[in-house]
């Protein structure tokens, strides 16, 4: 596995060299930063709800959005969705997720084939027995005709059973057979690589192919992607399938992908969270961004550092202020990205007592150290490492919020440009 040293922030890390793929103008792989993507859970045939969700995901920061294309009505809706999104100013690449009848839907709906930025093919259900290679080839030829990339997405829940059986039988004939788990991992990797080789034989360029091999267990995911990275230079899409709900899904996805990303493996990621009933679908985008930003690979939103609290911080003021600042940042980022270029690099500290508060606040671009239990009811504020004010009274939170807003305007806004 060849690698190069790439620097995001100030931290170099070994980045696996892969072939870059353009997905609707968004580069995946090569020397491009790791791309964040997401998937809708609406009925694609429902144009209004799908447009609304894609727009929300794009506003949240998703750089590519995948939609289900499972029947004629869904395929017919895709061009309408694309057109409506463009009218709303959301020029985000749409990926068509095809299973079982993708070859037929693309052939019957040329406007859908044209509107999509990428096709996802699952080798495990693209076709069965003697129809498998033909139907796979049909989709690849469609991608060539419309100049679209494909993601060959293997999933262990729908793995090619003929391939798995062949490898299991061959393994049993060996003198020292591998475990069933190892054979399963090998089958997943081979399914992706065999399909990629077939696509290239048909005429699809390597710069049009992205691979993924999704499983639901952390150690399996690490093993499978490590094998893929060692045996090919295709761009890789990372994702832990069926990660689950809430903190379990976040922790599992972050643990698996964090290890792979630190090794330089992975060109685009999706955090597959099961949303709670009525939950916000954009949560998966936020988690993906926070994973990449926490590891120092990309910058998306200003970082708010806050202490966890202890017996010295019985007041909830610092917790409420940290939450308010974080929510305010998330809410304003779509506007700030346009108005304040570079604001993503901002760091804010909201600390709860005198022990670490002043020191942490000095390390941030702007920080406040609120009084802990029994401390003098005052809050020093630090800007660029220097103490600039001491806030007192019931309006500390509001005063600090205004100072943050003023700092952003002065550092990233029009005032900075005029001064320079």
Swiss-Prot record:
Top-level taxon in the UniProt lineage: Bacteria
Chain ranges passing through the membrane: none
InterPro entries per the UniProt record, alphabetical: Dihydropteroate_synth-like_sf (IPR011005), IspG_bac (IPR016425), IspG_bac-typ (IPR004588), NO2/SO3_Rdtase_4Fe4S_sf (IPR045854)
Purpose: Converts 2C-methyl-D-erythritol 2,4-cyclodiphosphate (ME-2,4cPP) into 1-hydroxy-2-methyl-2-(E)-butenyl 4-diphosphate.
Keyword Kinase among UniProt keywords: no
Cofactor note: Binds 1 [4Fe-4S] cluster.
A Pfam family it matches: GcpE
Pathways involved: Isoprenoid biosynthesis; isopentenyl diphosphate biosynthesis via DXP pathway; isopentenyl diphosphate from 1-deoxy-D-xylulose 5-phosphate: step 5/6
Family: Belongs to the IspG family.
Record's catalysed reaction(s): (2E)-4-hydroxy-3-methylbut-2-enyl diphosphate + oxidized [flavodoxin] + H2O + 2 H(+) = 2-C-methyl-D-erythritol 2,4-cyclic diphosphate + reduced [flavodoxin]
Residues forming coiled coils: none
UniProt protein name: 4-hydroxy-3-methylbut-2-en-1-yl diphosphate synthase (flavodoxin)
E.C. number: 1.17.7.3
Cofactor entry: [4Fe-4S] cluster
GO biological process: isopentenyl diphosphate biosynthetic process, methylerythritol 4-phosphate pathway; terpenoid biosynthetic process
Keyword Metal-binding on entry: yes
Enzyme category, top tier: oxidoreductase
Record keywords, A-Z: 4Fe-4S, Iron, Iron-sulfur, Isoprene biosynthesis, Metal-binding, Oxidoreductase
A molecular function GO annotation: 4 iron, 4 sulfur cluster binding
Binding site for [4Fe-4S] cluster: 307, 310, 353, 360
